[in-house]
Amino acid sequence: IYHKIVNLNTGEVSPFPYPENTNLTYVSPFSEDNDKIHIIRSGWTTASTYSYADLAQPSLPEKKLGFRKEFNYPFAENITSKEVFVKGHDGVEIPVSIVYRKDLELNSKNTVLVYGYGAYGYSTSAFYSPILLNLVEKGAVFVVAHVRGGGEKGEDWHMAGFKQTKPNTWKDLNSTAQWLIDNEYTSP
């Protein structure tokens, strides 16, 4: 949701049409004399995928490169993820990633693991972890609060959780926990 393509010749900016809840871990030119690029991506439920795409194509179709065997979590089809925005203590919207079983019941009885890191402008992007997927498969909910101090929304977001504004970082985490309670993911 944060990726854009910038044409350096024209300055034109367009969205990078990629599956939601995936992280582009690497993008580089396929060769200097065409518009193709190498792409490595992963997601909350998808191991790293190596592929290439042609920037000249409007839909940017992805072609998988078969030189690496893909390993996916065996029960990944039972797990999904979504991105929500949680209103912070001061009204600012905090991006939050939620990874959960597709058959999750919102009954306030779920075990929830909340992770948040907001410092040095570091962004916590979607990453693949069979260990966390195993926890989710057993019924837990994994939540990443992209709190201020991190880099998810640029330098202003980083500075909004730095030095004098550092309390925003843990207040964002508290707001996320309260949202999870209010929306019956879990209880205190």
Name what the model sees in each region.
Residues F67-P188:
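Cap/lid segment of the alpha/beta-hydrolase catalytic domain
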Residues I1-I5, T45-A53:
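Structural motif
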Residues I1, N21-I40, T80-E83, S129-L133, ...:
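Conserved beta-propeller blade repeats
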Residues T10, D33, W44-T45, D90-E93:
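Short flexible coil/turn linkers enriched for glycine and charged/polar residues
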Residues L8-Y26, A56-I79, N183:
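Multi-bladed beta-propeller domains
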Residues N34-K36, S51-D54:
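Cytosolic C-terminal regulatory domains/tails of membrane transporters and channels
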